[in-house]
């Protein structure tokens, strides 16, 4: 039997995704739930989740109450530990360079706000504990659904060891997103199963309407961040359903997905030959821009974020087509002093046609959208399979951009420094 969510559930699921995260976001605050009530409810829902998920409880799920201030501090501390130093700021600079987020965005502040907006609870795989905020009324249907989601994470941890999974790989966002999608997608589908069994006859669409209100931080966040935030739940659930239908529900945990390409195209995960990402090295190990230059950020973007980059510029159809056939990629950002930067990005594609489609679409995106105010059409020249945009050349503030294609590969260079522009890898 093919598993599919009933149509009436999608509105509620969409609303829930604005409420649930690694630290699940707020449900209705009501009367304070005491420890005895929490003990009873967690034990009850744990049994129900275990039965629905088909994973026996190996041990009782530990849980504790926290004040709201303690829980918010916990989330901030976890973010600082998993994204150390200026990692977030360097990610922000890259995202702005390629046009993913507006230049006014403060990525650290926005991310912290998203993770702490009306925080209600979370499961911590390091301690194996479920934390619930004081004053969180666990008797509401919404609260029980969110508890079911987080208890599913506890079960995943007991059986598959979440702490060993690559959820915070600093140099491969695509791998981390694929891993998160398996974990969150599974818990999201469990939550839907729990909801369907426990809350039959309720006006779930009305509940969805109430839940989607009051998400001021989420609504004000850049579209790129909102989509990334929701992707592991929505697309992850569809991936888990596909895996369950084709193989079994635990297959993604026995051998984790390794790319968002596999999440978006489950047949590339469940097929007889998994389509694994190509390992790409953007620059040779001995590449150097000279004195004063420092490599500040290296990462993998992946199919999902490539498609999303086009989507936020109202090119969703073009982006989906351009991102299809992704084989692998890697970028590196170099910076010097306060202003100079040089961005290098190499992508590999399944076919030469895939590479050509990406090159053409990216040229349109940068020329007509991202950098349309920075140069005139006369600045853009085409030579063979390379597109060059050198700006006016009057100052080091002018952007220089190169998109070059060779067979299955597309190489991108963006810099505001003439020396870096002339230094080719």
Language model: regions and residue ranges:
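Short pre-active-site segment immediately N-terminal to the catalytic Zn-binding motif
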Residues: 130-148, 178
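A metal-dependent hydrolase signature that marks the N-terminal structural subdomain at the beginning
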Residues: 27-105
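Pan-zinc metallopeptidase signature
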Residues: 216-340, 354
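Catalytic zinc-binding patch centered on the HExxH motif and its immediate surroundings
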Residues: 73-86, 107-128
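Short helix/loop segments within enzyme catalytic domains
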Residues: 189-215, 244-257
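Post-HExxH zinc-binding segment in Zn-dependent metallohydrolases
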Residues: 45, 157-208
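C-terminal soluble interaction/assembly domains
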Residues: 327-425
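Acidic helix-start/capping segments at beta-turn-to-alpha-helix junctions
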Residues: 58-78, 168-174, 207-214, 257-261
């Amino acid at each position: 039997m093919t598993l599919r969510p009933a149509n009436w559930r999608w509105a509620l699921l969409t609303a829930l995704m604005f409420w649930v995260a690694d630290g699940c976001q707020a449900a209705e605050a009501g009367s304070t739930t005491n420890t005895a009530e929490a003990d009873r409810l967690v034990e009850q829902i744990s049994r129900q989740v275990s039965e629905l998920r088909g994973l026996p409880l190996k041990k009782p799920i530990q849980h504790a109450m926290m004040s709201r201030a303690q829980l918010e501090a916990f989330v901030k501390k976890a973010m600082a530990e998993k994204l150390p130093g200026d990692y977030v700021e360097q990610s922000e600079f890259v995202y702005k360079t390629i046009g993913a987020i507006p230049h006014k965005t403060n990525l650290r502040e926005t991310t912290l706000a998203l993770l702490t907006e009306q925080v209600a609870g979370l499961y911590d795989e390091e301690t194996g504990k479920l934390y619930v905020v004081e004053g969180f009324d666990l008797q509401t249907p919404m609260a029980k659904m969110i508890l079911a989601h987080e208890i599913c994470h506890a079960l995943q941890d007991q059986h598959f060891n979440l702490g060993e999974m690559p959820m915070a790989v600093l140099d491969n966002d695509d791998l981390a997103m694929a891993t998160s999608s398996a974990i969150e997608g599974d818990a999201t589908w469990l939550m839907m199963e729990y909801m369907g069994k426990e809350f039959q006859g309720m006006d779930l669409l009305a509940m969805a309407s109430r839940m989607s209100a009051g998400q001021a931080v989420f609504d004000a966040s850049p579209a790129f961040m909102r989509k990334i935030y929701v992707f592991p739940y929505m697309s992850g659930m569809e991936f888990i359903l596909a895996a369950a239908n084709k193989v079994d529900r635990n297959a993604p945990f026995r051998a984790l997905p390794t790319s968002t390409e596999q999440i978006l195209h489950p047949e590339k995960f469940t097929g007889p030959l998994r389509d694994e990402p190509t390992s790409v090295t953007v620059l040779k190990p001995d590449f150097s821009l000279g004195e004063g230059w420092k490599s500040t950020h290296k990462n993998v973007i992946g199919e999902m974020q490539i498609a999303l980059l086009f989507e936020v510029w109202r090119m969703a159809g073009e982006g989906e087509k351009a991102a299809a056939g992704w084989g692998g990629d890697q970028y590196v950002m170099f910076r010097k002093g306060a202003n100079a930067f040089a961005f290098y990005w190499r992508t590999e594609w399944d076919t030469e046609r895939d590479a050509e489609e990406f090159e053409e679409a990216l040229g349109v995106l940068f020329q007509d959208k991202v950098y349309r105010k920075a140069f005139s059409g006369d600045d853009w020249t085409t030579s063979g399979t390379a597109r060059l945009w050198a700006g006016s050349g009057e100052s080091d503030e002018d952007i220089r951009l190169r998109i070059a294609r060779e067979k299955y590969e597309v190489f991108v260079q963006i810099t505001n420094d003439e020396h870096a522009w002339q230094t080719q890898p």
